[in-house]
């Protein structure tokens, strides 16, 4: 897999191994060859993610993770499976970009009483599923996406994040 990892915040020492593990597990679950996928991941702080959230979502507040899919793969029908990424015969298929904020992740993990590594892994899986066309706005889509997240995290030995809330 091609992972373009940018660490803007020095506290993100755990991000490289977590990203490799979470992305590999997600792509495997989705039946995608990691060697044919390209993802950009930004490890930042709350100030940076607040600016990104304001710019792209018009929400000037911190959030845990943001994603920008390279192409719209969303299913047309509620609860439907998104389209598969189109193969790129010249190299890796760019799936999109993910940004994740250390401060918010740490706060949320502490509040939930779970290890930050587990929470960050969940958020990387979550962000990557967004790049692959999954969403959680409609109830049927949320059920599908959360089920995939739970299955992928279970394969990594991480408890269901939705039963810990």
From Swiss-Prot:
Any Gene Ontology biological process: rRNA processing
Annotated compartments: Cytoplasm
Keywords in alphabetical order: Cytoplasm, Endonuclease, Hydrolase, Metal-binding, Nuclease, Plasmid, Ribosome biogenesis, rRNA processing, Zinc
Cofactor: Zn(2+)
Signal peptide: none
GO cellular component annotations of the record: cytoplasm
Co-factor remark: Binds 1 zinc ion.
EC code(s) of this entry: 3.1.-.-
Top-level class of the enzyme under EC nomenclature: hydrolase
Nuclease is among the record's keywords: yes
Amino acids binding Zn(2+): 126, 130, 136
GO molecular function, one term: metalloendopeptidase activity
Keyword NAD: no
Annotated Pfam families: YbeY
Protein purpose: Single strand-specific metallo-endoribonuclease involved in late-stage 70S ribosome quality control and in maturation of the 3' terminus of the 16S rRNA.
Family classification: Belongs to the endoribonuclease YbeY family.
HAMAP family named in the record: Endoribonucl_YbeY (MF_00009)
NCBIfam families with a match to the protein in the record: rRNA maturation RNase YbeY
Protein name as it appears in the record: Endoribonuclease YbeY
Taxonomic source organism: Ruegeria pomeroyi (strain ATCC 700808 / DSM 15171 / DSS-3) (Silicibacter pomeroyi)
The encoding gene: ybeY
């Amino acid at each position: 897999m091609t992972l373009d990892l940018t660490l803007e915040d020095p506290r993100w020492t755990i991000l490289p191994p977590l990203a490799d593990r979470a992305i590999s597990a997600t792509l495997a679950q989705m039946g995608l060859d990691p060697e044919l996928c390209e993802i950009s991941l930004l490890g930042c702080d709350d100030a940076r993610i607040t600016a990104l959230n304001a710019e792209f979502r018009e929400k000037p507040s911190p959030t845990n993770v943001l994603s920008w899919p390279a192409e719209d793969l969303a299913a047309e029908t509620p609860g439907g499976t998104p389209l598969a990424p189109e193969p790129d015969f010249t190299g890796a298929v760019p799936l999109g970009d993910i940004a994740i904020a250390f401060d918010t992740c740490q706060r949320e993990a502490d509040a939930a009483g779970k290890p930050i590594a587990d929470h960050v892994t969940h958020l990387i899986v979550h962000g990557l599923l967004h790049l692959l066309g999954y969403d959680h706005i409609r109830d049927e889509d949320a059920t599908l996406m959360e089920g995939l997240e739970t299955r992928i995290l279970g394969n990594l030995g991480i408890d269901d994040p939705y039963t810990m809330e």
